[in-house]
Amino acid sequence: MKFGIISIFPEMFKAINDFGVTARAIKDSKVSISCFNPRDYTTDRHATVDDTSFGGGAGMVMKYQPLSAAIEDAKNTLGCGTKVVYLSPQGSIFNHRKAQELLQNDSLILLCGRYEGVDERLIQDYVDEEISVGDFVLSGGELPAMLVMDSLIRLLPEVLGNKESVVEDSFYDGLLDYPHYTKPAVLPNGNAVPDVLLSGNHKEIAKWRRKQKLIRTYERRKDLIECLCLSAKDKQILDDYKIDKVSTKGEE
């Protein structure tokens, strides 16, 4: 997969290039990243990429000309049909489903805004989709872009050493992940790993993990549960959990 990054701070993307799973994917030629700095496409000696906002107001707005030139160059490099995604608080929320949708593209151009944002006319002329990573505001689009890239890269075939790592992740099946434990089996304070995980009975372990995924999602993200078509067995697990929870409260 190919990424084109439009950013005035391309150095920030060394984190993607140099560390962890994403760095390994780049080294193995499963991913390529090209950065296009709008300052390189300016026409004045100060390399100006922003200006004041028409109508007044605080903050500066990123200019149309250098951004459009950077996007055009990115399209020439990655392909004229490459989808342009603008990382913006006004965009649709990024989630696992959106990640899978974006994976259908062989290449993506990620536009990272700064200041108060970009000239609206650039969005009208070049942006195919606006994506937000949450209902909060950051200083720029670079961190959201890296978040999106990391999420997509780890979903690519053969990027993770164990393909089960992707299948068992939170949100892959619409549920949160189950609890994980490692050695020692018992901590000095007596807190122990659930016995079933030490039993070696893979069928019972799978049942326990499914139950934990359902309960954890119900407790922390009921909105996800409401969007799923649960099996009769899954529904029974949750019904039993709710009954046990009420009974436990009644005994307190």
UniProtKB/Swiss-Prot annotation:
EC numbers on record: 2.1.1.228
Pfam families reported in the protein's UniProt record: tRNA_m1G_MT
GO biological process entries: tRNA N1-guanine methylation
Recorded GO CC terms: cytosol
Annotated S-adenosyl-L-methionine binding sites: 113, 133-138
Keyword set includes Cytoplasm: yes
Root EC class: transferase
Predominant place of localization: cytoplasm
Record localization: Cytoplasm
Any one GO MF annotation of this record: tRNA (guanine(37)-N1)-methyltransferase activity
Protein family according to the UniProt entry: Belongs to the RNA methyltransferase TrmD family.
PANTHER family recorded: TRNA (GUANINE-N(1)-)-METHYLTRANSFERASE
Subunit record text: Homodimer.
NCBIfam families named in the record: PRK00026.1 (NF000648), trmD (TIGR00088)
Protein name in the entry: tRNA (guanine-N(1)-)-methyltransferase
Name of the coding gene: trmD
